[in-house]
Amino acid sequence: GLRGMAVDHTLILVNGKRRHRSSVILWSAGGISDGAQGPDTAVIPGLALKNIEVLRDGAASQYGSDALAGVINFNLKDASEGGSIEVRTGEYSEGDGSMTYVSGNFGMPLGSNGFVNTTFEVGSSDETDRSVQRTDAATLIADGYEGVPQPAMKWGRPNVDDDMKLFINFGADLGNNTEVYGYANTTTRDI
């Protein structure tokens, strides 16, 4: 989170509207974010973003208590024509964590005064492992205790297969100071 506060103390907006919280509750062994439940911004493909606005000051008086640390607004692309394709691949210097992702974004007109902008991303990444055995766990193992995992604490990134994201942003001017707009997304990944 911003300003050293828990992740659910930063308000996340998409196109100026509140983003719902994730179903994941964070736990990091006594960290500042224990019990926090913030939005999952990893479901937004980077290619879908027009820009990101960050308000680093507390904004609780304007937005409520979930903006104590600040506000981050993800603005989605709203082009009604054109597009792009992006391919990313790489790995860590340790020889693990290889990843490959393909993203695409394209805009289409919606009537004479509107747009539909669609972004997809598919890919996968292999796990990374930077674990070392904790000394207290190593002592327990040396003393004959069974059931102590090796390593006791894993550090790294899990294997991610079939990581698929789809974001659709749309809007249209209906005249007479009336506008219809919205966005929809779906995502799935096997971890």
What spans do the regions from the language model cover?
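Short acidic/polar hinge/loop motifs at secondary-structure boundaries
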Residues: 17-56
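Transmembrane beta-barrel wall of Gram-negative outer-membrane proteins
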Residues: 81-84, 94-191
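N-terminal periplasmic accessory domains that precede
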Residues: 1, 13, 39-42, 66-87, ...
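Outer-membrane beta-barrel channels and translocator barrels
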Residues: 7, 46-49, 77, 111-113, ...
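Extracytoplasmic beta-strand/coil segments of soluble accessory domains associated
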Residues: 1-24
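Short beta-strands and strand-coil junctions in structured, solvent-facing domains, enriched
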Residues: 8-9, 19-21, 58-62, 92-94, ...
